[in-house]
Curated annotation (Swiss-Prot):
Annotated source species: Alnus glutinosa
Record text on subunit structure and interactions: Homooctamer.
UniProt entry keywords in alphabetical sequence: ATP-binding, Cytoplasm, Ligase, Nitrogen fixation, Nucleotide-binding
InterPro entries: Gln_synt_N, Gln_synt_N_sf, Gln_synth/guanido_kin_cat_dom, Gln_synth_cat_dom, Gln_synth_gly_rich_site, Gln_synth_N_conserv_site, Glutamine_Synthetase
Note: Irreversibly inhibited by the herbicide L-phosphinothricin (PPT).
GO MF assignments: ATP binding; glutamine synthetase activity
Main location: cytoplasm
Compartments, record wording: Cytoplasm
Reactions this protein catalyses: L-glutamate + NH4(+) + ATP = L-glutamine + ADP + phosphate + H(+)
UniProt similarity note: Belongs to the glutamine synthetase family.
Domain GS catalytic residues, every copy: 106-356
Residues in GS beta-grasp domain copies: 19-99
Official protein name in the record: Glutamine synthetase
Length: 356
């Protein structure tokens, strides 16, 4: 076993200039991640220097067998915390051989919105709070829970410590450090209200980079849970009953909101979000109706409301933002399995480009 460990941790830079690039893409469900690796002749400093590639889309539910080739375009890369050295993780989006984005490629549409001059001028910042649940592999039941049973009621677990309150911290901390190593702008972690559930935050990130970083962080997390023999779940309500669901609260601000007088801009943006509530809900993740019930720190899925420091609202404004008259707001509606390209670009489109 020690030899296997030594080989896994082998530092290639001692023997060769070649590097390994792990190409990562979103699979046919729109939430699953796939990847495969190839050897490059040497280190690269920009995605444009990476060779294009393709994969069998018929095996991922993204193309028919008689025309199965799906093409990658390389968009962003990060340092590889698993292979280390000059090796990299590459975030790709996906196209037909004719150059058309395939249906699961939501990055393409998001990039159009984020490149719009009115959006570029406002420098949109995002901070995404990604909640997730760790499950025991063989029984698909939360980590630390008795099989077929339940722990004590919620209360002691949020940001809790101790062997009877926090399960999976080694995975969480490994992920935190791996993301920092990779160059992802991960800004924190914490234990969540339901035991076995955790959260990491990415941001502030500008525009399309928020989606790239969240997907890269999700990939790293699932690779770590694979090593640990634990299952990663992004189900927005993994356990029915008196247990919190899992969301991806999305914090947002524009240049105008961050400047003096920005609170009035924030209120106008929230009003526009309310007018398009149904459209946003439809795009904010599968199964969200099981989570947005009006209980467990959520607003009812059919109701739009906002408030200061109100975690039962659709949109929460912080006390500091109200006091200072500028800042940001939090959209609490997105589910944990949301596509960050969809959510971030839709918020920008509604608040900056859409005319009621």
């Amino acid at each position: 076993m020690s030899l296997l460990s030594d080989l896994i941790n082998l530092n290639l830079s001692d023997a060769t200039d070649k590097v390994i690039a792990e190409y990562i893409w979103i699979g046919g469900s729109g939430t699953d991640l796939r990847s495969k690796a190839r050897t490059l002749t040497g280190p690269v400093n920009h995605p444009s220097k990476l060779p294009k590639w393709n994969y069998d889309g018929s095996s991922t539910g993204q193309a028919p067998g008689e025309d199965s080739e799906v093409i990658y375009i390389l968009r962003q890369f990060f340092k590889d915390p698993f292979r280390r050295g000059n090796n990299i993780l590459v975030i790709c989006d996906t196209y037909t051989p004719a150059g058309e984005p395939i249906p699961t490629n939501k990055r393409h549409g998001a990039a159009k919105i984020f490149s719009h001059p009115e959006v570029v001028a406002e420098v949109p910042w995002y901070g995404i709070e990604q909640e997730y649940t760790l499950l025991q592999k063989d029984v698909k039941w939360p980590l630390g829970w008795p099989v077929g049973g339940y722990p004590g009621p919620q209360g002691p677990y949020y940001c809790g410590i101790g062997a009877d309150k926090a399960w999976g911290r080694d995975i969480v901390d490994a992920h935190y450090k791996a993301c920092l190593y990779a160059g992802i702008n991960i800004s924190g972690i914490n234990g969540e209200v339901m035991p076995g559930q955790w959260e990491f935050q990415v941001g502030p990130s500008v525009g399309i980079s928020a989606g790239d970083e969240v997907w890269a962080a999700r990939y790293i997390l699932e690779r770590i849970t694979e090593i640990a023999g634990v299952v990663l779940s992004l189900d927005p309500k993994p356990i029915q009953g008196d247990w919190n669901g899992a969301g991806a609260h999305t914090n947002y601000s524009t240049k105008s909101m961050r400047n003096n007088g920005g609170y009035e801009i924030i209120k106008k943006a929230i009003e526009k979000l309310g007018l398009r509530h149904k459209e946003h809900i439809a795009a904010y993740g599968e199964g969200n109706e099981r989570r947005l019930t009006g209980r467990h720190e959520t607003a009812d899925i059919n109701t739009f409301k906002w408030g200061v420091a109100n975690r039962g609202a659709s949109i929460r404004v912080g006390r500091d933002t109200e006091k200072e008259g500028k800042g940001y707001f939090e959209d609490r509606r997105p589910a944990s399995n949301m596509d960050p390209y969809v959510v971030t670009s839709m918020i920008a489109e509604t608040t900056l480009l859409w005319k009621p």
